[in-house]
Structures are given as C-alpha cells and as structure tokens.
C-alpha cells in the first residue's frame, strides 16, 4: 500500500518539476541509495524526490486507523533501521526487523513458520501490481512511469536504473555531466533490488520469479486504480 502511495507522489513530483524546475528527478524509496547520493552529490540533493517511502506511508496509514498500535517493519533491508531512526522525518515505525533476524527469533522459540495455518482475513489483496513490483530493480521507475502515463498518456518519460551503489554512483556522475537531463533516475543499493537485501534469506532469482507471479495475481495494475490514492494529503504531515 505504501508503494502505491509513493508511486503517485513521485509521479506527480516528476510531472511538476521536470524539466521546468530541475533537469532530472531521482527516486527516494531506497534509503541507502538516497543517503549516498545526497552525501556524494549534495548539489543534487533537491533533485531526489521528497516523496515519503513505502515504509513510512504504510506506517502512517496504519496509525490513522489505530493511533495506539505498535508498528514493526519486517523486510530484507537493513538500511530501514537507519531510516526509522531519522529525526528529520516522522516515521511512525517502532521496530525494524530483517527476515534473517525474525527467522532467528522463530528458531529460538521453535516456531515452524511453514506449518502455521493461513488466515484469509490477513490476505493482502489491496495493492496494485506496480506497487508489488517495487521490490526488484527497475520496478519503482516502471510504476512511476505507468502512473504518469495514466495521468498524461502523451508524456514522454526517459528512465535509467542503477543497481548496486557503485553503479548508482556512476549514474549520478553521468547525471552531473548532463547526460540524463529530462530523465527519471532509479537507484537501488542492492544488486537486483530489495529482494537481494542484506537481511534476506531466499535466493534472489527465486524471489524474482515468485514476485512476478505475485504481481500477476494483483487485483489491479496501476497505482492510480487503488482506493487509497487520495490518502496522501493527510499522510504527508
């Protein structure tokens, strides 16, 4: 759900700012990438989208429903620990646990996760295919492009994606040289995207195949088809 909202905000940012007010725009949802870009290329800090990340947007949405709840982010990304502790952005996230860490907890308590019964009430069927695609390299940019084309079918959007911090740095060097004016830049710190994060357990290639299937099962494709699309106005503050 947070990925859906992040998509919409970044799409609107790009349409408003590029190229009228800035030569390019970079995505913001990978904290390791955005921190690196801002530190090594401070002159372009304002060109990285100010959109809140999927983690923060999802947490704020849940807090709206239940202000007293405690929120834990569970995923493959160790850099989310840094993001959740930032004081510049209110994250609403109380705990960040990687897949590797939570598996250690299960093993310590002798919990066999594979044998736990499914609960139909906990099915996640309210996200778009584009939102689910955030976890792989190229997925964020594709979601943003699809949202832009939904709002303005004739809008041309050129995209370049980088995976791994070394390639992300090269991408920013090219942008500095003026090679990517008018582009949407997507950076992913982990080669392959979030599915290959430092705290993951599964083989990234297998995860990518499973994600493709998961996207195909989504009840909608475009982020703008989602019922929560109008939630951004009150979640950003």
Go through each PLM region and give its residues:
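Iron-sulfur-associated redox domains of electron-transfer enzymes in respiratory
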Residues: 1-237
